[in-house]
Amino acid sequence: MLNPSIDSLLQKIDSKYTLVTVAAKRAREMQLANNCVVEKPVSHKCVGKALEEIDAEALSYVPSEDKVAE
């Protein structure tokens, strides 16, 4: 079972694809700098820690105004 739940995460970020992108970028930052904002993360992996940061609202993103041309 995923902790935090996908439903909880999708309340914070509107799209599954955006959620994956934000979490992956943050996980990469954590691998390089070894800094986690959450006090006692449940997960020991960087992606899990990034998802916990998103769920705790310690990590946010600003959506780009650029739209893909259709």
From Swiss-Prot:
Pfam families: RNA_pol_Rpb6. InterPro entries: DNA-dir_RNA_pol_omega, Pol_omega/Rpo6/RPB6, RPB6/omega-like_sf. One of its GO terms (molecular function) is DNA binding. One of its GO terms (cellular component) is cytosolic DNA-directed RNA polymerase complex. Its EC number is 2.7.7.6. Keywords: DNA-directed RNA polymerase, Nucleotidyltransferase, Transcription, Transferase. It catalyses: RNA(n) + a ribonucleoside 5'-triphosphate = RNA(n+1) + diphosphate. One of its GO terms (biological process) is DNA-templated transcription initiation. Promotes RNA polymerase assembly. Latches the N- and C-terminal regions of the beta' subunit thereby facilitating its interaction with the beta and alpha subunits. The RNAP catalytic core consists of 2 alpha, 1 beta, 1 beta' and 1 omega subunit. When a sigma factor is associated with the core the holoenzyme is formed, which can initiate transcription. Belongs to the RNA polymerase subunit omega family. This is DNA-directed RNA polymerase subunit omega. It comes from Bacillus cereus (strain ATCC 14579 / DSM 31 / CCUG 7414 / JCM 2152 / NBRC 15305 / NCIMB 9373 / NCTC 2599 / NRRL B-3711). The gene is rpoZ.
